[in-house]
Amino acid sequence: MYNDKLKICSGPETTGWISEQLMTGKIPVTDIFIDIDNKPDQMEVRLKPSSRSSTRTCTSSSQTEVNYVPLLKKVEDTLTMLVSATSRQNAAIEALENRLSTLESSLKPIQDMGKVISSLNRSCAEMVAKYDLLVMTTGRATSTAAAVDAYWKEHKQPPPGPALYEENALKGKIDDPNSYVPDAVQEAYKNLDSTSTLTEENFGKPYISAKDLKEIMYDHLPGFGTAFHQLVQVICKIGKDNNLLDTIHAEFQASLADGDSPQCALIQITKRVPIFQDVPPPTIHIRSRGDIPRACQKSLRPAPPSPKIDRGWVCLFKMQDGKTLGLKI
């Protein structure tokens, strides 16, 4: 009877009923704990609930695995695509770096042309200054100088037809306080003053200004504010005072043509050009050592009794406290 009930019922009700029957002694304990070897036919009663549970668990696990497999497949495919895209990107970056290196190498000659272009720019500026003055002071003169002067004074500008002036006459008008010369003409004349007319003496040796010579030498020197930059200023100043800028420029270019470094070329100028031999360096008055360019600090030395430029002494810095330091190369 109770076997039939066990087969029909299952779940908590069956468990409670079995417990009650065991407590009251209506069901023998041996009938519940079946000996598998002796009573294989009763395995169905005891294992029936567990077999259902086991089936449900297995089915749930199988469903979970079935659900995860496509997701894992998608993740794997996505990672594969990401790795492939990253590899292509790395290859593209490497190719771009190679192209940039090639482009940089190709542009290096153009960078070296910068110095030549700078020199041409200065030459063109002088040519423009000459042209400005030429237009203002020469041409088909149809009026006298007096008429031109009257027109300038009245209209504050040159007449439409340019008047022909000699350079010396124009210089005399500019120097004469009673004569009126337009500002534009004066400016053009000052710009032209940086050049000189070709003669038998300076033919093939075009005049160069101290500013242009300084810029040319600066273009060859590395860094900024070094002792050699200071030496360039001293050389240009002394060369301008002695009207030997052309000689200094020629000496500098000759040293470079011989393969000397720019620094060596500057030193050769101080030893070969007579105006620098046995000449004391200039004295520069400063407030403190901090006013000296940082690049020159390591080249400062206590000033000797009689320093000379051709012995490597560029200049002397005299501070307010009376201390004097020499710039030595």
Curated annotation (Swiss-Prot):
- What are the Phosphothreonine sites (modified residues) in this protein? 195, 199
Q: What is its main location?
A: virion
The protein's GO terms of the molecular function aspect are: RNA binding
Q: What does this protein do?
A: Plays an essential role in viral RNA synthesis and also a role in suppressing innate immune signaling. Acts as a polymerase cofactor in the RNA polymerase transcription and replication complexes. Serves as nucleoprotein/NP monomer chaperone prior to the formation of the large oligomeric RNA-bound complexes. Regulates RNA synthesis by modulating NP-RNA interactions and interacting with DYNLL1. VP35-NP interaction controls the switch between RNA-bound NP and free NP and thus the switch between genome replication and genome packaging into the nucleocapsid.
Query: What residue stretches are annotated with the VP35 IID domain?
Result: 204-329
- GO terms, biological process: symbiont-mediated suppression of host cytoplasmic pattern recognition receptor signaling pathway via inhibition of IKBKE activity; symbiont-mediated suppression of host cytoplasmic pattern recognition receptor signaling pathway via inhibition of IRF7 activity; symbiont-mediated suppression of host cytoplasmic pattern recognition receptor signaling pathway via inhibition of TBK1 activity; symbiont-mediated suppression of host toll-like receptor signaling pathway
What's the PTM story here?
Phosphorylated by host IKBKE. Phosphorylation contributes to efficient viral replication and transcription.
**Position(s) of the covalent cross-link Glycyl lysine isopeptide (Lys-Gly) (interchain with G-Cter in ubiquitin)?**
298
What name goes with this protein? Polymerase cofactor VP35
InterPro entries to which the protein is assigned, alphabetical: Filo_VP35, VP35_IID, VP35_IID_b-sht, VP35_IID_hlx
Q: Which family does it belong to?
A: Belongs to the filoviridae polymerase cofactor VP35 family.
Q: Which residues form a coiled coil?
A: 84-112
Assembly and oligomerization? Homodimer. Homooligomer; via the coiled coil domain. Interacts with nucleoprotein NP and polymerase L; VP35 bridges L and NP and allows the formation of the polymerase complex. Also interacts with VP30; this interaction is regulated by VP30 phosphorylation. Interacts with host IKBKE and TBK1; the interactions lead to inhibition of cellular antiviral response by blocking necessary interactions of IKBKE and TBK1 with their substrate IRF3.
Organism (species): Reston ebolavirus (strain Philippines-96) (REBOV)
